[in-house]
Amino acid sequence: MNIIKKSLITIALCGAALCSYAADVKPYVEADALPDALNYYPAPPDTMSPQFMYDISQYMWGKTMRKDSARAALAVAQAAETVEEMAAMFSEPFGMEISAKKTPAIMNLLERGVLTLRKVGSKAKRHYMRRRPYDRFNEPTLVPAEEERLRTNGSYPSGHTARAWAMALLLVEVNPAAQDALLKYAYEWGQSRVIAGFHWQSDVDASKVLVSGAYPSLHTNETFMADMRKAQAEFKKLKAAAKPAATKAGKK
């Protein structure tokens, strides 16, 4: 089964289970201790700039990509926001099922880590309140149910991309051997926001820089480092246990 089909099945199952953040999840680092995007990252492109022309061209590209039914379906699936949904979808590039039941230490790391890093763009979102492409052009998106809610939520930077990029970086540290697959999947998650019509390309690009810039701040937190060691140990244990099972299955 390919990654697109698995993503669609995953989001359906998570939706049925009413996936949500645990109410008691706390960030490792408070938002005001993270790098301030307003102090170091540029404002969104001016509407008369060459950079904005590129944003428009990418929006047009995104609409052509909707003709690919499989890619469009992936863009819809990647409109997921909860850590539970996202972790299940990242399981394939990670190489192991990620869930509260199967990998509690890894899930704890993701819940707290993503909650921390996704806030890195919140201040910029409120400050710029950039208009989203579908709203600017008065055109439909791939997820109509989200249009009204997001119309009053700033476009720059992309929150979905921030969550996906944060999850990829956390999982890469747990399983470095899967780094290429994880980063590729997170990259496509960002592009899905362009394809779906919710974000400009510069929104997506900004999120990856902001999250990458904030990630080192996690390493100053002792609780994060302890949780990372637990997640790494859990992964190694499960991976080691899976090898004998795979060997036995191959001999049958």
Where in the sequence are the language-model features?
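Hydrophobic alpha-helical bundle signature of multipass membrane enzymes
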Residues: 24-196, 220, 227, 251
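Bacterial N-terminal signal peptides that target proteins for export
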Residues: 2-8
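Interfacial helix-loop-helix junctions of multi-pass membrane proteins
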Residues: 188-219
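Residues in and immediately flanking transmembrane alpha helices
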Residues: 18-19, 173, 216
